[in-house]
């Protein structure tokens, strides 16, 4: 079982509903459409994640939180959709959401259909 987050460049949506609509459009465009190299901001964000947590493909001790790798392969243009192991999702998703905000990016949780980080994170 995995837990997913989507992160993208753009204006912060007004609410969770607007974020869900933006997510649906961006996912269809960038994950189901033609694959593009990640933009510089998305690339910097993914590299920051990999500075914090080991890449799944380099994980010899089962400590990587990622469910797929290489993580950079999950990015396309101004959008990245990544999965993490459910057993590590609480800590990792909260920190990944904070890191996205620090990079000026939008973070959306498609399971709970809400923007992240939340006010209690």
Where are these regions (language model features)?
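Acidic (Asp/Glu-rich) sequence patches and key acidic residues
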Residues: 1-121
